[in-house]
């Protein structure tokens, strides 16, 4: 591919000394794999190293490379994992002897997953100290192309809103300096070619496997080239490296799609489910939980939790989670963080007793923790005020009346870890929600933010190792630390503190660009919603929450019997489709920021099942019909919509779509479940072969069998298969050809039975006495004769509702007769009888 590189004398673009007098060779104009400061490349850099004299320069030259089986791993950091035969590692070593530094570029290639990972190890090979001032994990240079930058901005309770910006000359930069990946920007970016849509166009993704400060820079330079960088934020970062020490830059996951944004998202979803999350629960059905927070906040007792468990069990909920307020003197958010001892007075007994009482109700038990925090009004702070992060000589910045414990220090982590383990060892705790409700402010050293995050990872690694059966859910005021680093330890993260169903459609939409549905904590909450005051129906809240891990945040005792029954039905529905929702291929069908609906769907791997969810976001008088086009189906397959019983071809569903019912109220929601009629495809192949062997201009095929054999479903699907291949096919129901309308025919059957018994009834059913075989035989004969117009009979439900209609049969070469009596000896003109023994 070196032919794409061009060389010219670029004014004011310097030339490396090694290039001699060649003024056409400039690092300022050529793509770089890992650009550094001080080389004559004036674009944004990946690496900046300062030596003991304060010189900032690193001229990295190729030293060696190695390709090996398996995927590299990173000590103390989360990273993509793979079996030995699923990945390869490329390691490129760059060196600057003058700066006395080696840079190891690590590439993990997961070919079947369409994923490449990148990380960097920086080694001080000298005798003195060096300082890393900036370190990106990956750099991508493009010599041409017009791109849009897709980033995901937000705030507390409204995270990961998609913003698409054309990349003009200069730099688009975003990131976090809050100590976490943050609510404000997610550590992820997409570079999409102009015009790229959900289903077409080229796009490149980068996802940082890290939960702390990060920086992303997209730059279009003077020569219309593009550079994309993602890595550690250089602000508040200055990492000293002593002689012989090595620093590891966290990993970036890269992927590319030539088929639009949906395909890119699906590649990331598969990677996270199968190569990032390690929890045993990632591919398991997870418990539907109810959390005590919105039901009680801090105002609860042990009896309150048990009562909640009783209600939960009666509703089919699997687990009760006791949220904030069970420890120390924690009756509000001003005290006791750091004192992880059970408040037995508040609970009315020991935690072990409470766990037993909850389990006796037939539900599991979960608990809330916030290990990284401390209140000044706590025994821990009074004993160790120096354990809170603060700048010496300066009062700390408070947030939510709490301070941040210095998890970069092992003794701090060990103390809190021992406290948490003492709690978890008191009984069978099935679930833990790990929260973090403030950002880092008092950064006292350049290494703090990085070492802090590694301390959190160390704590979580120890927790997961000690309690492998524990379901861990991450949280940081909702989605303030929703990143791939956290998903390495917890298979799900509370998506947002905002549980409003309408806001959630947008939050979950933005989240889905990189993260799978199985990672998104989503619950049905009470109305008016506690964050927005909005009122939406129970059904709408349920449909939205089913695009996540599904659970409840409300007080069951305040619900009506009708609402409680809705919960039972919602749980049944969710559990029926849970595997499809969490493991299926996810498709975005609308943009809830611009469209009048939010719509999404999940399709099974075999493309034989699909669940479509739609929420109306606006309502207006005399509203036009809204159509939803589906994606990811087999074009030639026939699908049965479970609720209506209607059948559609995959092509029709994807190109024409399905019309939504007229709305009756604001914020309505709908779900449509589709199942492929597989037997029709198998039957079609056999019938098609028969037709090809027995070449006739017109063929009559009779599908017959007893009640419940699936004649109607199969015949409708078979007709669609013929139409799909361009064969004109008409479906005729034999139910229009009894002598009498159904009501009168039932009366006649009863009369015959009363007068002649069972033998007489058998002599009536399906014979010429009941059926007008002469009339239907005339239809079949006219069809075989090639007539273009044939008179068909229509039988209604009431007296006098018997009519005839001239029907156009021009272009029809296959007549499908669907009828219980389609195998009768009195029926003439059938070319291929097909008997159905049982329901498909």
Which role fits each region the language model picked out?
Residues 1-219, 235, 638-644:
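Polysaccharide-binding surfaces and accessory modules of carbohydrate-active proteins
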Residues 58-62, 239-258, 670-674:
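Short Pro-Gly-centered flexible turn/kink motifs
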Residues 198, 591-634:
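Carbohydrate-binding surface patches
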Residues 281-421, 431:
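Aromatic-lined carbohydrate-binding/catalytic grooves of carbohydrate-active enzymes
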Residues 346-350, 382-539, 549-554, 558:
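Active-site neighborhood of glycoside hydrolase catalytic domains
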Residues 618-678:
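C-terminal beta-sandwich/jelly-roll accessory domains of carbohydrate-active enzymes
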Residues 730, 739-796:
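Conserved nucleotide-sensing/catalytic segment adjacent to the nucleotide-binding pocket
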Residues 801-839:
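ATP-dependent NMP and nucleoside kinases share a basic, alpha-helical "lid"
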């Amino acid at each position: 591919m070196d032919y794409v590189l061009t060389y010219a004398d670029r004014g004011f673009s310097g030339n490396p000394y090694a290039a001699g007098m060649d003024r056409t060779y400039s690092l300022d104009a050529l793509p770089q794999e890992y650009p550094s400061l001080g080389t004559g490349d004036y674009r944004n850099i990946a690496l900046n190293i300062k030596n003991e004299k304060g010189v900032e320069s690193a001229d990295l030259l190729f030293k060696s490379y190695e390709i090996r089986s398996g995927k590299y791993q990173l000590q103390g950091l989360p990273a993509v994992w793979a079996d030995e035969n699923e990945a390869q590692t490329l390691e490129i070593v760059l060196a600057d002897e003058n700066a006395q530094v080696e840079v190891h570029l690590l590439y993990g290639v997961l070919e079947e997953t369409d994923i490449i990972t990148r990380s960097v190890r920086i080694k001080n090979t000298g005798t003195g100290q060096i300082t890393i001032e900036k370190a990106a994990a990956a750099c991508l240079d493009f010599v041409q192309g017009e791109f849009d930058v897709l980033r995901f901005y937000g705030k507390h309770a409204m995270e990961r809103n998609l913003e698409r910006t054309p990349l003009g000359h200069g730099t688009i930069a975003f990131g976090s300096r809050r100590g976490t990946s943050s609510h404000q920007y997610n550590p992820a970016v997409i570079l999409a070619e102009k015009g790229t849509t959900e289903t077409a166009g080229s796009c490149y993704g980068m996802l940082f496997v890290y939960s702390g400060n990060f920086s992303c820079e997209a730059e279009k330079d003077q020569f219309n080239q593009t550079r994309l960088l993602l890595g550690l934020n250089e602000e508040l970062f200055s990492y000293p490296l002593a002689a012989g020490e090595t620093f590891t830059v966290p990993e970036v996951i890269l992927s590319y799609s030539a088929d639009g944004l949906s395909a890119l998202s699906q590649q990331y979803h598969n990677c996270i489910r199968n190569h990032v999350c390690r929890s045993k629960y990632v591919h398991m059905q997870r418990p539907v939980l109810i959390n005590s927070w919105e039901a009680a906040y801090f105002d609860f007792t042990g009896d309150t939790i048990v009562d909640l468990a009783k209600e939960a069990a009666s509703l089919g909920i699997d687990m009760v989670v006791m949220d904030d307020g069970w420890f120390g003197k924690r009756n509000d958010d001003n005290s006791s963080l750091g004192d992880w001892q059970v408040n037995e007075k508040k609970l009315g007994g020991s935690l072990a007793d409470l766990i037993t009482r909850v389990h006796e109700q037939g539900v599991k038990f979960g608990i809330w923790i916030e290990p990284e925090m401390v209140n000044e009004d706590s025994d821990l702070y009074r004993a160790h005020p120096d354990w809170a992060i603060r700048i010496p000589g300066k009062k700390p910045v408070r947030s939510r009346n709490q301070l941040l414990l210095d998890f970069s220090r092992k003794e701090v982590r060990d103390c809190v870890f021992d406290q948490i383990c003492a709690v978890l060892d008191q009984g069978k705790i099935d679930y833990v929600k790990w929260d973090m409700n403030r950002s880092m402010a008092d950064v006292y050293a350049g290494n703090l933010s990085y070492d802090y995050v590694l301390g959190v990872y160390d704590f979580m690694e120890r927790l997961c190792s000690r309690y492998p059966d524990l379901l861990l859910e991450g949280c940081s005021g909702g989605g303030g630390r929703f990143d791939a680093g956290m998903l390495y330890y917890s298979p799900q993260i509370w998506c947002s503190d905002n549980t409003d169903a309408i806001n959630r459609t947008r939050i979950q939409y933005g989240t889905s660009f990189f993260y799978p549905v199985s990672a998104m904590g989503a619950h049905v909450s009470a109305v008016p919603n506690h964050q927005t005051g909005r009122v939406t129906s129970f059904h709408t809240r349920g449909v939205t929450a089913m695009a996540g891990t599904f659970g409840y945040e409300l007080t069951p005792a305040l619900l009506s019997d009708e609402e409680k029954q809705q919960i039972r039905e919602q749980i049944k529905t969710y559990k029926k489709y849970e595997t499809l929702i969490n493991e299926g291929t996810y498709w975005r069908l609308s943009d809830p920021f611009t469209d009048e609906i939010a719509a999404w769907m999940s399709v099974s791997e075999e493309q034989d099942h699909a669940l479509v969810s739609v929420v109306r976001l606006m309502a207006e008088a005399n509203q036009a019909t809204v159509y939803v086009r589906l994606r990811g189906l087999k074009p030639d397959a026939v699908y049965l919509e479970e609720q209506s019983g209607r059948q559609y071809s995959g092509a029709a569903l994807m190109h024409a779509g399905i019309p939504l019912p007229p709305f009756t109220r604001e914020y309505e929601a709908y779900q449509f479940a589709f199942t492929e009629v597989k037997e029709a495809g198998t039957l079609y192949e056999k019938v098609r072969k028969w037709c090809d062997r027995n070449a006739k201009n017109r063929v009559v095929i009779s599908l017959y069998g007893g009640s419940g054999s699936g004649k109607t479903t199969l015949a409708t699907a078979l007709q669609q298969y013929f139409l799909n291949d361009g064969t004109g096919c008409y479906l005729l129901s034999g139910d229009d050809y009894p002598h009498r309308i159904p009501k009168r025919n039932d009366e006649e059957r009863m009369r015959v039975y009363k007068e002649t018994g069972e033998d007489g009834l058998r002599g009536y059913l399906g014979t010429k006495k009941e059926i007008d075989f002469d009339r239907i035989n005339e239809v079949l004969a006219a069809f075989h004769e090639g007539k273009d117009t044939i008179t068909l009979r229509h039988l209604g439900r009431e007296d006098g509702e018997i009519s005839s209609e001239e029907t156009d049969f021009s272009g029809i070469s296959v007549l499908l007769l669907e009828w219980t009596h389609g195998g009768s000896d009195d029926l003439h003109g059938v070319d291929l009888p097909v008997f159905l023994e049982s329901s498909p």
